[in-house]
Amino acid sequence: MKSLWLDIGNTRLKYWITENQQIIEHAAELHLQSPADLLLGLIQHFKHQGLHRIGISSVLDTENNQRIQQILKWLEIPVVFAKVHAEYAGLQCGYEVPSQLGIDRWLQVLAVAEEKENYCIIGCGTALTIDLTKGKQHLGGYILPNLYLQRDALIQNTKGIKIPDSAFDNLNPGNNTVDAVHHGILLGLISTIESIMQQSPKKLLLTGGDAPLFAKFLQKYQPTVETDLLLKGLQQYIAHYPKD
C-alpha cells in the first residue's frame, strides 16, 4: 500500500512516497510562500501513483491548510493533518498550551520517545530546536537562531566587515574576522548543546540539514543522525490515529 507524506514548512515543501514502509520517492522544493500552487503542480503526478492515504505536517495557517486540503481532495483518498495534543500515543506534551508547540518538533519527539529512555532531540534547520524527553514525557525545550541567522544578524549590525560564505569548520580561535565570526557562532551553539547534555544522562539525536556538521563536534556524546525523523514521527502519528 502506497502512502504520501507531506512536510510543509515556511519555505519548503517536502514529500515522501512510501510502500511497505520503504521510501520509494522523495523530493524537496522551495514553495516561495505559495505551497498550494506548488502542490497543484504535483497533483497529476500523485494521481498516477496509486496512493491510499496522505499524512501531513504543516506549519501554515488555517487558510493555507484549507487550500491544501481542497487540492488534495482531487486524489479522493483519506487526508490527515497531524496536530499537537496534550497526550497522544502515550506521549505527554511538555508545553502549557500544546497548540503552541511546533508540529515539526512534536512529530520528531513522537518518533523517538520511549518508556525507559531519555532523549535530547535537536532539529538543525532554520532555527536550532532542542527538545528533551524523559520516558514518554516531553519536558519542553529551547529555540535558538541557527548558524546562518546569527551570522546574518551580525553582518547587518556590523559596519565595515564583509563576511563571505565560509564554512563553519572548526572551533579554534579565529585569526581573522571571518574565522572569528564563524567559529564563535559555532562554538556558542555547540557549548549550549554540551551544557544540556551534561545536566543528566540522555541520548543525543540530531536531524535536519546541518545535523552532520553538529555531529562532528559532539562525538563524545555518540550522536545519532536521523535524516527522516519527521517522516517517522508522521508515520507514528497516523499509526495511532483513530480509525473511522
Swiss-Prot record:
The gene is coaX. Catalyzes the phosphorylation of pantothenate (Pan), the first step in CoA biosynthesis. Keywords: ATP-binding, Coenzyme A biosynthesis, Cytoplasm, Kinase, Nucleotide-binding, Potassium, Transferase. Its EC number is 2.7.1.33. Substrate binds at residues 95, 102-105, 177. InterPro entries: ATPase_NBD, Type_III_PanK. The active site is at residue 104. It is found in: Cytoplasm. It is an enzyme of class 2 (transferase). GO terms for molecular function: ATP binding; pantothenate kinase activity. This is Type III pantothenate kinase. HAMAP family: Pantothen_kinase_3. Its cofactor is NH4(+); K(+). Pathway: Cofactor biosynthesis; coenzyme A biosynthesis; CoA from (R)-pantothenate: step 1/5.
